[in-house]
Amino acid sequence: MKYMLMMRFMNQYLERTLSWLGAYEVPVVLLSATLPFERKNRLVSAYMNNAEAIQPDYAAALPRITYTDKQSIETINFPKSEQQNTVKLSYVSETDIVETVNKKMANGGCVGIILNTVSRAQQLYRLLRASDISADMLLIHSEFLPSDRIRIESQIRELLGKPSDKRTRRPERCIVVGTQVLEQSLDIDFDLLITDMSPVDLLLQRIGRLHRHNRVRPSGLDNPECYIISRGDEKDTSELIYGRYLLKADKGSVEL
């Protein structure tokens, strides 16, 4: 529910801001990896002071640039990346996470685990540290002091950054446990992803950290695979963040 209310008001503020910027002819650039057509239509319309809606073209390719000078609207399509991955989705019980990680890392690998609350991330991190898994382990969440968070994010980039970056020192085995901070802004690459259920747009953001770069993968992790955590407790704390209806609706749309 908190997430739904936040998004509702944020969208209203964004549209009003765009209408003001459009009125003063201020150039604006909006970037998104998961922008539905209807949402893009509302944003462009707000900038054009509620001008006529864009005609949908669902067959058009992505990625795409939509441009307006307030007089007309143009779209420019770009060729897709040659790297096309099909991600396998599976469920994993919360009680089986440590065992699954240990099994999947039999030949090495870098695993990302994204949880929806700080307390759950801390708890799982402690369980992994107490297990017999041999790997570098890092914990990242929003409640660290800014200086500590910057330091940890720098470590994560160094471990999981682009192969072309000379600063990247990818280890043979590592596990990064974190919250939503891992789905935003960090250009990092996991061999395997385990995540709490979240709204589909955010789930896609998380999956975007899986097999992100071209590199040789450990045996058994050659193909991108994402485990969605199946929780048995009735009071799922994720529902307090995203809302029960939204999570259940999006869970039904995820094909496993």
Go through each PLM region and give its residues.
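C-terminal helicase lobe and adjacent C-terminal extensions/tails of nucleic-acid helicase motors
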Residues: 40, 99-169, 190, 194-256
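Residues immediately C-terminal
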Residues: 2-8, 36, 120, 184, ...
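Conserved interdomain linker/interface between the two RecA-like ATPase lobes of SF2 helicase motors
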Residues: 26, 51-121
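Post-DEXD/H (motif II) to motif III coupling segment of the RecA-like Helicase ATP-binding lobe
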Residues: 3-75
